[in-house]
């Protein structure tokens, strides 16, 4: 139905002029009737856009429990009023300053994706009104964050962040459901500690790195010392064995001289220069 058509007809009649004579009263009445009819039709219809739902408030019976989907619907003018709700999920960021188990202050930013329970729209309007999310979400998010964060130390908020997020999500969904608000997603987007705590953590990390470096140097020195001891023990044992061999077997010295002479001769044979050596140079004079 074209809502502008009755007003267009009225405008055309005004341009042509009202009938004169005995038909003047009839023409005026028809014009008024058409205008009233068009106005009544226009005020008796309301539209519900996509992603929205509507309920009615009646001056006689109050809020009705019927929920109107998308499309055009009728209402009684001056008696009924349509109340529109956006039922699409809406994001909202809420910050909360709270304390940890070890009394460290931390600023947490929580992002929630919320929407109203369509079947509970009349109850939501009766108890909370149209700005239900503004009335409920900031308070319950702060309450849940404070209760969950107080169970963990500051360091655990970093190492166990997934567990913290899960507890916040579960508790927040339960609290929001009491107000007929559905949460499609809850996430901790930002966790910021105090400057003093951040500086203390950095100092602790530097100290741990220095301690690990010192431990490495100590271990390396200990290993080098152990290597020297083993080498000295080996050399001492070798000297002891050589002394015993010389004492018990006099020919051991001649054997070592022959081995030394062979090594010298082998080295000189590979040289480009020709060198004449006598037996004394090769330590062979004393060999019996």
Swiss-Prot record:
It is found in: Mitochondrion inner membrane. The keyword rRNA processing does not apply. This is Prohibitin-2. It is a single-pass type II membrane protein. One of its GO terms (biological process) is mitochondrion organization. Keywords: Membrane, Mitochondrion, Mitochondrion inner membrane, Signal-anchor, Transmembrane, Transmembrane helix. GO terms for cellular component: mitochondrial inner membrane; mitochondrion. The keyword Mitochondrion applies. The gene is phb2. A motif (AIM) lies at residues 125-128. GO terms for molecular function: mitochondrion autophagosome adaptor activity. PANTHER family: PROHIBITIN, PROHIBITIN-2. Disulfide bonds: none annotated. The mitochondrial prohibitin complex consists of two subunits (phb1 and phb2). The subunits assemble into a membrane-associated ring-shaped supercomplex of approximately 1 mDa. Prohibitin probably acts as a holdase/unfoldase for the stabilization of newly synthesized mitochondrial proteins. Involved in mitophagy; may act as an adapter for atg8 that supports mitophagosome assembly. Negatively regulates the proteolytic processing of atg32 via the i-AAA protease. Acts as a negative regulator of the m-AAA protease. Its main location: mitochondrion. The chain crosses the membrane at residues 21-43. Gene3D superfamilies: Band 7 domain. The lineage of its organism: Eukaryota, Fungi, Dikarya, Ascomycota, Taphrinomycotina. Belongs to the prohibitin family.
